[in-house]
Amino acid sequence: MKTLGKLLAWALVFLLLVLFFLPKKPLYFEGEKLLKPQHVILSNERVSDTGFGLRISGGTLFYEDLQVAELSELNITPWLVYNRIGIAPFRLAPAMKSFLPETIDGAEVIYSVFDPLHIRVEASGDFGTLSGTIGLRDRQMRFDLTPSKQLRQLQPFWLKQFKKTQEGGYRYESTY
């Protein structure tokens, strides 16, 4: 019984050391290279390793040469069994105001080995709240949107892609 306890303690120490010394910055830059063919670029950011995570401060997000947003901070937590990307409050670029209200309070993307077939997404802001899942096996996306009064007044064209629910919200379902 004592040796089992020692074995588990050493396994935990080994796992913590792997997480701490994981080359997070090079992995981040490889991820950026993977996004480039999709025309998604994050520029002028400052990347810092926080030990068990990665912090990206500042930066401008572009999609197909169009400025989408000015980001204040992203926190990436790659813990192997539980991975999280937390996006701090940010403002959309002036060109995006016809698509969404300007301020996003925050967003979170979570992947866990305890639910390996789904990625959870949650966001909130002047547009309301959004929560959903992305299915990795069935390749389906499902998002529920509770729109704010400001979004209802704006009536962006993309809201027509959502189906109205009985609760007064909207649902988007699609395959990819």
Where are these regions (language model features)?
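Hydrophobic membrane-insertion alpha-helices, especially the h-region
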Residues: 2-21
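Alpha-helical transmembrane signal-anchor/signal-peptide segments
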Residues: 23-40
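N-terminal beta-strand/beta-hairpin edge segment
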Residues: 39-117, 122, 126-128, 146
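Extracytoplasmic/periplasmic C-terminal soluble domains
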Residues: 129-176
